[in-house]
C-alpha cells in the first residue's frame, strides 16, 4: 500500500511546488514596476509573466496526465524538482535587488552604468531568460518532451543518447565524467570554467537543452573542448552573461580604435553568437553571424578588417588551427530512393518546394534539404519550423550538391547502397533523404548516371548591424 501511495505523494508535492513558484513569480512581478526595468532584453517585466504562464501550463498538463510523462532518474519529475528549487533561489536573489512591493521607483544604482547592482541584476535577468527558454524547450505548451528532444548537432545528439539515455538532466559531476570519455576534461580550474560555461541556469546540473546550446556555440564536435578553450577560456574578446546594452557601454572606451570587438552568447538567440565591434567611423555595431563556427567568423572578420583588437587589446589570438577545412560530407542516395525521384520526373538535386533551383541549404537538426530562396521565403512568413517535417529550425548550413563520379552508381554496380550511411558533422547518422512532397508539375528528370554528393561551403558574409532585440540574420 505504501508503494502505491508514494507516487501520488510526489505528484501532490510537485503540484504544490508549481503553485508556489507561480505565486512567487507574481509577487516578483509586482516589484518590477519601474519602467526602466524593461528598456532592453532580457527584460524581467516580460520574462516573469511568461515563465509563470508556462508553469501553469506544465501544472495543468501534469494534472491531466496524473503526473505523467517519463519518470525515472533524470526524467520530467527530477527536472522539475531541480528547476523549481533553482527558480526559487534565483527569485530570492532578484527580490533582494528590487524595491519592495508598493514602491514604484527602484534604486538608481540599479541603472547606473558599470555599477555592481546593475551587473548583478543583468546577470540574473539573463539566467531567467535561459530558464524560460529551457522550460519552453523541454515542456512546449506545458507537455514534457525531454526524452524526445533532438540536439541540433548530430554527433552531440548521438553522444547524449548513448551516454545519458532518455534522461534530460543529470548532475554536473556525472556529466563531466561521461563527457570525459570522448572529450577529456582537465580537473581543477578548467573543469570549473567548463561548468560555468555549460550550466546556463547555474543549477549545478546539465540539461540536454544546455548541452545543445553549448555544442552549437563551440562547434564542430571533433574539437569541441579545444574550440571552447581557445574561444572562451583564453580569448580576451569573450564575454559571458553580457547584455546588448552592456556591450555598447564596454566598447565606448574603444571608439577611437576601429576594429575593436568583443563577442558573447546571444541572450535572445540561444546557440548563436553576438559580436560587438567598432566600425571605421567609430560607430558601435552588433551582429549575429549566420550559422557557422565562431572561429571561422572571427578569421574572416580579421581578414576583412572588422575584428582586429579583442576588447581593445593589440594582440589578436591566432585561430587558424580552428579554421581548417572540414572533410567533405556525402549523402549516398539508395537505388530505391533514386527510383522514387525518377518516378516523379525529378532528381535528388532539385528543390522539392519550388522545383526550379537546386538544393543548397541543410536545415538543422532535421537535416532536410531545400534551396536558400525557399528557406528565406518560408522564414519570412514567420515560420520557424521545417516545411517538410515541422521540426523547429535551430540553424542551417550552406551545401553544394554536385555529381559524384568517384564510384559506380547503385544502378551501374548492381549493388544497393541502402547500407551506406550519410556522413555529417564528421559523425555517422542513419541514412535519410528528404521526404518527397507531392509535386505533379516537376520538370523533366536529369540523366541518372551518378550519385549526388553534398559538400559544406564556407562562404563570407559581412557583419550586419543589429538592434538590441538580437534578431536573426537575414
From Swiss-Prot:
- Which first-to-last residue range defines the signal peptide? none
Return the annotated region ranges for Linker. Answer: 322-350
For this chain, the Swiss-Prot or TrEMBL PTM comment says: Phosphorylated on multiple tyrosine residues by SRC. Isoform 1, but not isoform 2, is phosphorylated on tyrosines by EGFR.
Q: Which reaction does it catalyse?
A: S-ubiquitinyl-[E2 ubiquitin-conjugating enzyme]-L-cysteine + [acceptor protein]-L-lysine = [E2 ubiquitin-conjugating enzyme]-L-cysteine + N(6)-ubiquitinyl-[acceptor protein]-L-lysine
**PTM Phosphotyrosine: at which residues?**
341
* InterPro entries from the UniProt entry: Adaptor_Cbl (IPR024162), Adaptor_Cbl_EF_hand-like (IPR014741), Adaptor_Cbl_N_dom_sf (IPR036537), Adaptor_Cbl_N_hlx (IPR003153), Adaptor_Cbl_SH2-like (IPR014742), Cbl_PTB (IPR024159), EF-hand-dom_pair (IPR011992), SH2_dom_sf (IPR036860)
Enzyme class, spelled out: transferase
- Binding site residues for 4-O-phospho-L-tyrosine: 264
Tissue expression: Ubiquitous.
A Pfam match: Cbl_N
GO molecular function terms noted in the UniProt entry:
calcium ion binding; epidermal growth factor receptor binding; phosphotyrosine residue binding; receptor tyrosine kinase binding; SH3 domain binding; ubiquitin protein ligase activity; zinc ion binding
Protein task = Acts as an E3 ubiquitin-protein ligase, which accepts ubiquitin from specific E2 ubiquitin-conjugating enzymes, and then transfers it to substrates promoting their degradation by the proteasome. Functionally coupled with the E2 ubiquitin-protein ligases UB2D1, UB2D2 and UB2D3. Regulator of EGFR mediated signal transduction; upon EGF activation, ubiquitinates EGFR. Isoform 1, but not isoform 2, inhibits EGF stimulated MAPK1 activation. Promotes ubiquitination of SRC phosphorylated at 'Tyr-419'.
Per the record, the domain comment is: EF-hand-like and Sh2-like domains are required for N-terminal inhibition of E3 activity.
| Subunit structure, as described in the record | Interacts with ubiquitin-conjugating enzyme E2 UBE2D2 and UBE2D3. Isoform 1 interacts with EGFR (tyrosine phosphorylated). Interacts with the SH3 domain proteins LYN and CRK. Interacts (via RING-type zinc finger) with TGFB1I1 (via LIM zinc-binding domain 2); the interaction is direct and enhances the E3 activity. Interacts directly with RET (inactive) and CD2AP; dissociates from RET upon RET activation by GDNF which also increases the interaction with CD2AP suggesting dissociation as CBLC:CD2AP complex. Interacts with SRC; the interaction is enhanced when SRC is phosphorylated at 'Tyr-419'.
What this protein is called in its record is E3 ubiquitin-protein ligase CBL-C
| Annotated organism of origin | Homo sapiens (Human)
Q: What is the lineage of its organism?
A: Eukaryota, Metazoa, Chordata, Craniata, Vertebrata
Q: Which gene encodes it?
A: CBLC
Amino acid at each position: 500500500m505504501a508503494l502505491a501511495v508514494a507516487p501520488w505523494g510526489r505528484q501532490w508535492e510537485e503540484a504544490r511546488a508549481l503553485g508556489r513558484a507561480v505565486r512567487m513569480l507574481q509577487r516578483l512581478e509586482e516589484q518590477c514596476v519601474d519602467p526602466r526595468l524593461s528598456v532592453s532584453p532580457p527584460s524581467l517585466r516580460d520574462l516573469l509573466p511568461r515563465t509563470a504562464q508556462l508553469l501553469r501550463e506544465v501544472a495543468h498538463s501534469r494534472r491531466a496526465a496524473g503526473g505523467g510523462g517519463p519518470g525515472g532518474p533524470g526524467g520530467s519529475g527530477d527536472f522539475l524538482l531541480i528547476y523549481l528549487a533553482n527558480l526559487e533561489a534565483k527569485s530570492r536573489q532578484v527580490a533582494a535587488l528590487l524595491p519592495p512591493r508598493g514602491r514604484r521607483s527602484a534604486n538608481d544604482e540599479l541603472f547606473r552604468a558599470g555599477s555592481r547592482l546593475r551587473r548583478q541584476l543583468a546577470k540574473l535577468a539573463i539566467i531567467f531568460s535561459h530558464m524560460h527558454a529551457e522550460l519552453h524547450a523541454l515542456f512546449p505548451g506545458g507537455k514534457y518532451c525531454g526524452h524526445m528532444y533532438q540536439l541540433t548537432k548530430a554527433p552531440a545528439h548521438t553522444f547524449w543518447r548513448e551516454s545519458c539515455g532518455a534522461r534530460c538532466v543529470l548532475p554536473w559531476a556525472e556529466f563531466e565524467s561521461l563527457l570525459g570519455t570522448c572529450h577529456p576534461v582537465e580537473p581543477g580550474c578548467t573543469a570549473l570554467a567548463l561548468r560555468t560555461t555549460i550550466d546556463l541556469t547555474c543549477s549545478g546540473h546539465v540539461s540536454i537543452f544546455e548541452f545543445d546550446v553549448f555544442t552549437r556555440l563551440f562547434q564542430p564536435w571533433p574539437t569541441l573542448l579545444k574550440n571552447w578553450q581557445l574561444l572562451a577560456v583564453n580569448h580576451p574578446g569573450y564575454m559571458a552573461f553580457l547584455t546588448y546594452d552592456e556591450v555598447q557601454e564596454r566598447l565606448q572606451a574603444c571608439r577611437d580604435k576601429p576594429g575593436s570587438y568583443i563577442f558573447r552568447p546571444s541572450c535572445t538567440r540561444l546557440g548563436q553568437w553576438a559580436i560587438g565591434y567598432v566600425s571605421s567611423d567609430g560607430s558601435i555595431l552588433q551582429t549575429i553571424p549566420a550559422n557557422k563556427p565562431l572561429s571561422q567568423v572571427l578569421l574572416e572578420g580579421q581578414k576583412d578588417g572588422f575584428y582586429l583588437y579583442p576588447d581593445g587589446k593589440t594582440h589578436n589570438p591566432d585561430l587558424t588551427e580552428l579554421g581548417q577545412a572540414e572533410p567533405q560530407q556525402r549523402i549516398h542516395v539508395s537505388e530505391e530512393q533514386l527510383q522514387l525521384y525518377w518516378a516523379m520526373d525529378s532528381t535528388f538535386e532539385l528543390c522539392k518546394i519550388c522545383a526550379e533551383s537546386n538544393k543548397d541549404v541543410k536545415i538543422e537538426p532535421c537535416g532536410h534539404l531545400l534551396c536558400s530562396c525557399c528557406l528565406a521565403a518560408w522564414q519570412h512568413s514567420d515560420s520557424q519550423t521545417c516545411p517538410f517535417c515541422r521540426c523547429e529550425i535551430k540553424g542551417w548550413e550552406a551545401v553544394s550538391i554536385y555529381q559524384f563520379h568517384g564510384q559506380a552508381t547503385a544502378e551501374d554496380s548492381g549493388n544497393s547502397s541502402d547500407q551506406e550511411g550519410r556522413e555529417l558533422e564528421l559523425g555517422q547518422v542513419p541514412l535519410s533523404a528528404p521526404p518527397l512532397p507531392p509535386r505533379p508539375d516537376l520538370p523533366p528528370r536529369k540523366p541518372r548516371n551518378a550519385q549526388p554528393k553534398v559538400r559544406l561551403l564556407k562562404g563570407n558574409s559581412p557583419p550586419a548591424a543589429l538592434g538590441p532585440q538580437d534578431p536573426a540574420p537575414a
